[in-house]
Amino acid sequence: MATITYTVTVASGTNRHGTGNKFYLNGTVSPDINLIEGNTYIFDQSDSTNDTHLLGFSLNDNNDPANVYTTGVTQTGTPGTSGAKTTIVVAAFAPTLYYYCVNHAGMGATAYTLSGGLTSETTTFEKTFPVDDVVEE
C-alpha cells in the first residue's frame, strides 16, 4: 500500500461552494480527490495559512448536516504549526467522503473512495492465441 502526501494551504479562491477561503491541495483550489482503500493519505497542514483551519472528513458535503467520519483518521498538532497534519488510512469499503474545514464552511471538496483492488502496477498475462489468417499490408 502507498503513502501519499498533500501539502495543504489556505487562500482566497472559488469552488462549488462559492468564493472565500479555500483549501488548496498541492497548489490546486479544492480539487476532488481519489482515495484508494488501504492507502495512507497525509494532509500536511504545517503551512501558517492553515491556522484555525483543521481539515476533517465527513459523510456529507461541507459537513452539512454534521456527520463526521473518523474511521482511520488521525489529527496531529495544531494547523499552521510545524508537524501539523491530518492522516487517513482508507478503510475497506469506505464510503465517498468530503474533506472540509471543521471551523469554516465551503473550503473543501469530494474525496472519492476506490477499491484497493486498483493499483498502478501492470500485470502481464501470457497466453498464446491461434491465428487463422495473417493479414499483410
Regions found by a protein language model. Give the residues of each.
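Extracellular/periplasmic metallocenter environments
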Residues: 4-15, 25, 50-52, 71-121, ...
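N-terminal edge beta-strand
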Residues: 13-37
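Extracellular and analogous surface-interaction loops
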Residues: 31-39, 88-93
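Solvent-exposed, conformationally flexible loop/turn segments
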Residues: 36-38, 83, 137
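Acidic, Ser/Thr
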Residues: 45-49
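Beta-strand signatures of extracellular beta-sandwich domains
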Residues: 54-58
